[in-house]
């Protein structure tokens, strides 16, 4: 489990406020608090970052280019962090070495990027695993790509591989750079608790906050589990998804009743035909299969133009594909599921009236006709 500590600075209204402490002293105090937290028996790892925690409402941007290509700048989110960030949030190295190698890879002259960071830019010099070890230019400084992580997403409602929705540039947050932020409230202190720690950890930590985790003018204002940050960040998308599911259920119910009703009425109207076939020697099983086959044949004939129309709608991006890319496998799966759903509706619409028709004696059905 991960938590984010909200840091703050005492004001002159507090009796503990020391007006002689500078910004540099505040940042030193923040690092001291991070060190004390890392030694807590229930804490696994601690990191400091700036505008970089997952599900954060805002983000910073960064760009780099390759030295031999000054026309293509790869722009995306800037993950400005201390190395332990990759341990706290469990980023995975593509070489299978886990997060420990990422912690060692991030230094002042290196960056870490996901393996798909350049996929959005087809004219970039390098892509994929070829990025590893390459020199890049950021502002007026050269950096080396020291490690590649597996693709990540900004949240559950975005796809990986696109700028500001998944890809990022992981840069080193040095002591000097922390001082340029000036206020500890603009920095994030995140920690991961050990496995098996109960839900009372936050309460126990805050009980010790004033005694142990206040250094100089810097103190812990609040501790927020990342699950709550995620809920707050995704609540609008969650509500929209629920609304869409309600609309989808309503439409499916109407389609379900319409298709079943149509084939029910159609089969009911053919009672005389069923009786005549039975009178001519056809058995019930063959008649039933014939009615089902006719329904599925009508479905297949209407499905062909529907598939062509649906493919063109997706291919031309007339529908929203920002949250899930339009791919051939996805399209085929959707078509197959739709066909099966419609087939079930048709079978249900034919099943009961067909069985009822076959129970009627041929002479009685012909007399009714």
Model-derived regions, located:
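Intracellular coupling helices
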Residues: 257-294, 359-368
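Hydrophobic alpha-helical transmembrane segments of multi-pass inner-membrane transport and secretion
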Residues: 1-4, 237-272, 297-309, 341-348
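Membrane-helix entry/capping segments
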Residues: 213-248, 269, 314-337
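Membrane-proximal extracellular/periplasmic loop immediately following the first transmembrane helix
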Residues: 4-73, 78-79
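Alpha-helical transmembrane segments of integral membrane proteins
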Residues: 1-17, 273, 361-369
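C-terminal membrane-exit region of the final transmembrane helix in multipass inner-membrane proteins
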Residues: 338-369
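Mid-to-C-terminal secondary-structure elements
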Residues: 51-232
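Transmembrane alpha-helical interface segments in multi-pass membrane proteins
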Residues: 251, 272-318, 333-337, 341, ...
């Amino acid at each position: 489990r991960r938590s984010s500590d909200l840091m703050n600075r005492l004001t002159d209204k507090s009796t503990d406020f020391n007006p002689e402490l500078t910004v540099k002293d505040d940042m030193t105090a923040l690092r001291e608090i991070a060190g004390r937290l890392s030694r807590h028996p229930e804490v696994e790892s601690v990191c400091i970052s700036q505008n970089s925690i997952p599900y954060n409402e805002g983000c910073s941007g960064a760009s780099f280019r390759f030295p031999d290509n000054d026309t293509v700048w790869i722009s995306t989110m800037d993950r400005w962090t201390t190395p332990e960030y990759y341990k706290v949030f469990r980023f995975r190295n593509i070489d299978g070495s886990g997060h420990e190698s990422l912690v060692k890879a991030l230094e002042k002259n290196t960056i870490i990027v996901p393996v798909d960071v350049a996929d959005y830019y087809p004219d970039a010099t390098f892509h994929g695993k070829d990025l590893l070890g390459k020199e890049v230019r950021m502002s007026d400084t050269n950096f080396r790509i020291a490690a590649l992580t597996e693709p990540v997403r900004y949240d559950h409602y975005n796809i990986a591989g696109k700028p500001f929705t998944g890809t990022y540039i992981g840069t080193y947050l040095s002591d000097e750079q922390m001082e340029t932020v000036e206020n500890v409230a603009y920095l994030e202190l995140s920690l991961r608790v050990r496995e098996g720690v109960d839900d009372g950890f936050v309460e126990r930590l805050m009980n010790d906050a004033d005694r142990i985790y206040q250094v100089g003018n810097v103190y812990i204002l609040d501790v927020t589990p990342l699950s709550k940050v995620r809920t707050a960040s995704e609540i609008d998308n969650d509500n929209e998804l629920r609304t869409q599911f309600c609309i989808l259920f309503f439409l499916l119910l109407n389609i379900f009743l319409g298709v079943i009703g149509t084939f029910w009425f159609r089969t009911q109207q053919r009672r005389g035909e069923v009786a005549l076939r039975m009178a001519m020697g056809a058995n019930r099983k063959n008649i039933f299969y014939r009615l089902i086959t006719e329904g599925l044949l009508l479905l297949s004939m209407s499905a062909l133009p529907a598939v062509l129309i649906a493919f063109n709608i997706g291919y031309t991006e007339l529908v929203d594909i920002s949250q899930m890319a339009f791919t051939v496998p996805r399209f085929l799966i959707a078509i197959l599921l739709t066909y099966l759903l419609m087939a079930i509706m048709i079978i249900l619409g034919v099943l009961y009236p067909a069985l009822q028709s076959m129970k009627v004696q041929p002479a009685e059905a012909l007399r009714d006709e």
